[in-house]
């Protein structure tokens, strides 16, 4: 599984994201420009320049018409993908930690960090996607959810499959479900800080099932990832690692999840990647067991994204590199012992 290595950022990666078709890969880092790449060959299509500092998050709408970025410069920017033009900028009261389009692309959520005296919020903006009036967006959000009432600031967020709920991860290990129309808290769950004795339980990533977004995975500094059902809001699976996890993703087609993380650079005594545990880890989604690792980064993995058709994945690291992997035949053919037995029984060979 030889990757394409993309060198387009001067500093650590913060998020990578595929568009719905998977032909484009979007990336942001702790520098001030986002990049758009062809995922098939790693050629850079262009850059989105306009932020004045670190860009924490990026997302693209279902039509690959618009993309949004949020950064430490207190700005949320809306871009036209076709020409890389910034069509609108919303001001934020504090650094923007996460942006995410609703499944229909009509709304955009943004997390404003709980710093500088600002109460942490999740704001929802209505998106006008008419080409003729892209610059005429509503300046004020249609909904503001204050997350302070949960006793902890929001770190990550995303939408349920029907767009009815906003799922928010917090730095105290809790996950909350809010009604996306009223902003009311529906329920919350402690997803991290209960599986081991780790003190840092901050949730670092949330990604949804690619098929229908009916369940999602969270990663945490507590060295675990959890799979949670959107409707019942119960923990389905727990994946235990040996280092703080920064990111987690669910693969389509095959029943796997991918975790990424590693010890923070300042805590690693040698530069060996095995020492810092800087590999992408593959777990069986059902059986919760680790089945393999992929090396390559020379620092913690900060973000992973899986190709929508399940043919590969991309990872972005603290080392400033993006690695685009295409799965080989051994990945596609891999079966757990229980799966192999079940398949043989179905075929009548045992």
Swiss-Prot record:
GO cellular component: eukaryotic 43S preinitiation complex; eukaryotic 48S preinitiation complex; eukaryotic translation initiation factor 3 complex, eIF3e; eukaryotic translation initiation factor 3 complex, eIF3m; nuclear periphery
Chief subcellular location: cytoplasm
Localization per record: Cytoplasm
Record keyword Methyltransferase present: no
Gene3D superfamilies: YVTN repeat-like/Quinoprotein amine dehydrogenase
InterPro entries with a match to the protein in the record: eIF3i, WD40/YVTN_repeat-like_dom_sf, WD40_repeat_dom_sf, WD40_rpt
Biological role stated in the UniProt entry: Component of the eukaryotic translation initiation factor 3 (eIF-3) complex, which is involved in protein synthesis of a specialized repertoire of mRNAs and, together with other initiation factors, stimulates binding of mRNA and methionyl-tRNAi to the 40S ribosome. The eIF-3 complex specifically targets and initiates translation of a subset of mRNAs involved in cell proliferation.
Protein's name according to its UniProt entry: Eukaryotic translation initiation factor 3 subunit I
Originating species: Candida albicans (strain SC5314 / ATCC MYA-2876) (Yeast)
High-level lineage: Eukaryota, Fungi, Dikarya, Ascomycota, Saccharomycotina
């Amino acid at each position: 599984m030889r990757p394409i290595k993309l060198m387009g950022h001067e500093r650590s990666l913060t998020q990578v994201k595929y568009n719905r078709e998977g032909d484009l890969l979007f990336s942001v880092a702790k520098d001030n420009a986002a990049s758009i790449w062809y995922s098939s060959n790693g050629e850079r299509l262009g850059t989105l320049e306009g932020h004045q500092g670190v860009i924490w998050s990026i997302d693209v709408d279902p039509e690959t018409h618009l993309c949004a970025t949020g950064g430490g410069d207190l700005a949320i920017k809306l871009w036209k993908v076709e020409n890389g033009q910034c069509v609108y900028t919303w001001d934020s009261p504090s650094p923007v930690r996460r942006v995410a389009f609703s499944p229909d692309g009509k709304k955009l959520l943004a997390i404003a960090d709980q710093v500088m005296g600002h109460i942490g919020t999740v704001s929802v903006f209505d998106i006008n996607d008419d080409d003729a009036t892209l610059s005429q967006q509503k300046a004020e959000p249609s909904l503001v959810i204050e997350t302070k009432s949960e006793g902890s600031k929001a770190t990550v967020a995303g939408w349920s499959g029907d767009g009815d709920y906003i799922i928010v991860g917090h730095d105290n290990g809790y996950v909350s479900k809010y009604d996306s129309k009223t902003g009311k808290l529906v329920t919350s769950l402690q997803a991290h800080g209960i599986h081991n004795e780790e003190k840092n339980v901050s949730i670092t990533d949330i990604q949804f099932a690619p098929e229908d977004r009916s369940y999602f995975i969270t990663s945490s500094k507590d060295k675990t990832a959890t799979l949670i059902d959107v409707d019942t809001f119960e923990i389905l699976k727990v994946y235990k690692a040996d280092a703080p996890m920064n990111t987690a993703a669910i693969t389509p087609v095959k029943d796997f999840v991918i975790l990424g993380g590693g010890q923070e650079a300042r805590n690693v005594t040698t530069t060996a990647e095995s020492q810092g545990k800087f590999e992408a880890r593959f777990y069986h989604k059902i059986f919760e067991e680790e089945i393999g690792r992929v090396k390559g980064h020379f620092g913690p993995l900060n973000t992973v994204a899986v190709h929508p058709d399940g043919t590969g994945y991309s990872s972005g690291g603290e080392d400033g590199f993006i690695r685009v992997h295409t799965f080989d035949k051994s990945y596609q053919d891999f079966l757990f012992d229980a799966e192999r037995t079940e398949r043989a029984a179905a075929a009548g060979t045992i």
